[in-house]
Amino acid sequence: MSLKLAFGGKGGVGKTTVTSLIARTIAALNKGTSVIAIDADPVANLAAGLGIDETQPITPIAELSDLIAERTGAVPGTMGGFFTLNPKVDDIPDRFSIEKDGVKLLVMGTVLNGGSGCICPEATILKALMNHLVLARDEVVVMDMEAGVEHLGRGTSGSVDALVVVVNPGKRSRVAADKIRKLGKDIGIKNIVILGNRVKSEADKDLIRESMPDYEILGFMPELDEIVQSDRDGVRPFEDISNIPEELKAIALKLMALSPQ
């Protein structure tokens, strides 16, 4: 199965929890399917949602100085000068990912100088890796993005099967969704959908529907004690993924149906 999904949303809406649950659910429903989860949000912690032990060291790709220097021919932290703009990255997902229950995690990291658009070795590696993951891998790739979609360029965005914007009933998350959709459209993402999270009532669902009438609503996730308690305990929710609520399973199946193969 080949499927490329990006998840965005205002901080605090539960985007990372939703992303991890979708990745785990797809892996469980399709035994043998390769699922790669990309943590591309500097403040996210996708590892915890996937159940990866916090003592297990994870070095973000942007901080692998020796690898970046080897592949680009330039020392990380430098700008300008000459370096390779199309570095070899096809071995990175297998070499530097951590696997748990059929999901491989890759942490992208942050370019510390120059901003996301800087012409520097670290940014070049991250861009090349995202291009490879979206365009060249015949796998399920689930991306936990920043509030925007900065890691995706125009060259890769057309191959993203869906940008899923996670919202709560609150107004601020819905306003943020409008901004994220504009960013997504600007770089060529065609399928942008809404996932309502932490919904407590039919009134919450109606509020999201009525305030976002020109969006496709993928589905709604209820406020769940299991998720709240697992966050307090520092463990992943639904240790037995077969116990996920039907709403989440239905959302995962809808997303899987977007796969071109």
Where is each model-derived feature located?
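Walker A/P-loop phosphate-binding motif and the immediately C-terminal alpha-helix
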Residues: 3-42
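N-terminal phosphate/diphosphate-binding loop that engages ATP/GTP or pyrophosphate donors
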Residues: 28-101
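Conserved catalytic network of the ASCE P-loop NTPase/AAA+ motor domain
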Residues: 28-30, 98, 132-136, 156-158, ...
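Conserved nucleotide-binding/hydrolysis micro-motifs of P-loop NTPases
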Residues: 42-43, 111-113, 147-148, 170-172, ...
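Switch II (G3) loop of P-loop NTPases
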Residues: 108-114, 118-119, 130-152
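Inter-motif core of Ras-like GTPase G domains
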Residues: 128-137, 152-171
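Glycine-rich phosphate-binding loops of nucleotide-dependent enzymes
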Residues: 141, 145, 160, 193
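C-terminal lobe/tail of nucleotide-utilizing enzymes
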Residues: 183-261
